[in-house]
Amino acid sequence: MKKLSLVISVYNEEAVLEKFYNAFCNIEQDLKYGGENELIFVNDGSTDASMNILEVIAQQNKNVRVISFSRNFGHEAAMIAGIDHAAGDVIICMDADLQHPLECIAPIMAKFEEGYEVISMVRTSNKSAGAIKNFTSRAFYRVINALSDQVKLEENASDFFAISSRVADVLRTNYREKTRFLRGYVQSVGFRKTTLEYTAAERAGGASHYTLKKLMNFAISTIVGFSDFPLKLGLYTGAVSFLAAVLFAISALCGFREYKVILAAFNVLFAVLFLLVGIMGEYFSVAFAELKNRPIYIVEKEINSGRCV
């Protein structure tokens, strides 16, 4: 049996941590993993009692490791930190709210025994999400796949995935961008991969920390990170604008004097111009973040520490 590292991102999850740990202990006994596994909880700057609960759990079980950030660095940074510190042959990333079913661990491990190195978990349905969220999620993946020539994402793939230690080494070494889309990296890294389906359960407690603003910023950064198509819009828009200018010039020479139409057309072109400037600004901000080369995360405290990169 391969050694398992389970990476769990934690941000203000005091309502679910004990439930998650107890549920895993039950699954662990059923699967007979024994000590051949580790739970890595990454505390992403929680402001509630999450860290206190994790300290108690870690004292009870030496296979529970806790990595605590100096502040909130974000969900993606937490998962990257967990992968950086994981020592298992198989690394599974999942959330603490039990929406990612622990019962999926057994079929995931079975796939690794078959020789797969990347397992993407695909939601068939989400019991806690409304129709609008499900629609926007599908639209997000379709837009990314339409714009990107670098990666084709599995629709409804989530931050619930599993990778081999070899894939983890590639991520540790080569995928250190400051603007991250980890599930995109996992699906674009190559190696032998497959998918498994699951139904997202209701949250075991607490509330989702993803606001509309965070989701919008996440979508924009993902498009910038995986597609250069928005930059090419400038070329396409310039070509269309040039043709429009030629047509207006010909119309003026032929006696066309509808200046309101011309002014309206110029207003549209200026609006598009400012949009393109904004798009370029997003790309420049990403490049600037890379030039500053600040750390993806800062660890303030570790409990039961093992591997550290």
Protein language model regions, located:
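Structured catalytic core of nucleotide-sugar glycosyltransferases
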Residues: M1-G130, C308
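Structural signal for short hydrophobic segments within the conserved structured cores
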Residues: R65-I67, E154, T194
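Hydrophobic helical membrane-anchoring modules
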Residues: R183-V309
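Histidine kinase transmitter module recognition
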Residues: S9, I27-L31, V42, K111, ...
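Acceptor/aglycone-binding surface of glycosyltransferases and processive sugar-polymer synthases
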Residues: F69-R71, H75-H85, L102-R180, E202-M216, ...
